[in-house]
From Swiss-Prot:
Zn(2+) 2 binds at C97, C100, C103, C111. The gene is tdh. The active site is at T44, H47. The lineage of its organism: Bacteria, Pseudomonadati, Pseudomonadota, Alphaproteobacteria, Hyphomicrobiales. Coiled coil: none annotated. This is L-threonine 3-dehydrogenase. Pathway: Amino-acid degradation; L-threonine degradation via oxydo-reductase pathway; glycine from L-threonine: step 1/2.
């Protein structure tokens, strides 16, 4: 194996990514080196491409980015015991310290020292990625590479959707991006009574409808209260999944929740936006922030959903070779795509 590899690198502090040859990551005693088969583009990667304010203060330059992937093990460290070369795997992109109070209590997803693959350390937009043995997740043979490559965002959807009991509940999802759509699919699969998804992008709403979400609402043209009445809802929503990061959508969600409603918040809203806290108080709403996946219960549930027949592959709208990465990023930046999966070989 050569000691150099192709990779997409944030090599300059400006808009874009560049295909370069960089050293293959070194494998420590507890590490696993994975040959990447497929990578998917995340919204985080778009922020890094755009070199926005968050990226400028977060991403060291140069950096191999990316964190959504599927591949096969190419090399294992001297202390690795669970895995073998050739095994097909994905991996958890949040690397936790294992020493803080939350980690020691089995709540690794709450680790205050979390490092992100492709954010704080080299990522998966390369021919190889290296992660700790504890972050490796084996992929069953009946799950395709491209589906395993989007398990990171699917995990965000599963974690958010399953934050509260959904059986018989009326669920509002704000934001019909890939994670919002998958969250709505999980809610429907998990026994929700009514699942309504809102957005202002007709292409995303069309994709949501194609994937089986019965009630899609263009918030720029339709009144959500009228839609609720038309589908037989006489009270507010029991559960809200805020996936958009859009302040108007969040405010509308709070307004349409039933008393005692529960909201899981994954979307990252702009700084300084306002909500009516009086409604939160007097409706006695329960708000819960969501970040990443519960390790590794969410992964177990994802695999169970897919093996049980939940088909999330139509969320993938673009499949491209890695040399066409610019096309993939333009699709993501347009806001009119679902997931974009890039093939490394």
């Amino acid at each position: 194996m050569s000691n150099m590899m192709k990779a997409l690198v944030k090599s300059k502090p400006e808009v874009g990514l560049w295909m370069e040859h960089v050293p293959v990551p070194e494998v420590g005693p507890n590490d696993v080196l994975i040959r990447v088969r497929k990578s998917a583009i995340c919204g985080t990667d778009v922020h890094i491409w755009n070199w926005d304010q968050w990226a400028q203060k977060t991403i060291p330059v140069p950096m191999v980015v990316g964190h959504e992937f599927c591949g096969e093990i190419a090399e294992i460290g001297s202390a690795v015991t669970k895995y073998h070369v050739g095994e097909r795997v994905s991996g958890e992109g949040h690397i936790v310290c294992g020493k803080c109070r939350n980690c020691r209590a089995g709540r690794g997803h709450l680790c205050r020292n979390t490092l992100g693959v492709g954010v704080n350390r080299p990522g998966s937009f390369g021919e190889f990625v290296c992660i700790p043995e504890s972050n490796v997740v084996p992929i069953p043979d009946d799950i395709p590479d491209e589906v395993a490559a989007i398990f990171d965002p699917f995990g965000n959807a599963v974690h958010t959707a399953l934050s509260f009991d959904l059986v018989g509940e009326d669920v509002l999802v704000t934001g019909a991006g890939p994670i919002g759509i998958m969250g709505a699919m999980v809610a429907k699969r998990s026994g929700a009574r009514k699942v309504v998804i809102t957005d202002i992008n007709p292409n995303r709403l069309a994709l949501a409808h194609k994937l089986g979400i019965d009630h899609v609402v263009d918030a720029s043209k339709e009144n959500l209260a009228d839609v609720m009445k038309s589908i037989g809802m006489t009270e507010g929503f029991d559960v809200g999944l805020e996936m958009s990061g859009a302040a108007p959508a969040f405010r509308d969600m709070i307004d349409k929740m039933n008393n005692g409603g529960k909201i899981a918040i994954l979307g990252i809203a702009p700084a300084g936006f306002e909500i009516d806290w009086n409604k939160v108080i007097f409706k006695m709403l329960n708000l819960k922030g969501i970040y990443g996946r519960e390790m590794f219960e969410t992964w177990y549930k994802m695999i169970a959903f897919v093996q049980g027949g939940l088909d999330v592959s139509p969320v993938i709208t673009h499949r491209i070779g890695i040399d066409d990465f610019r096309e993939g990023f333009e699709a993501m930046r347009s806001g009119n795509s679902g997931k974009v999966v890039m093939d490394w070989f």
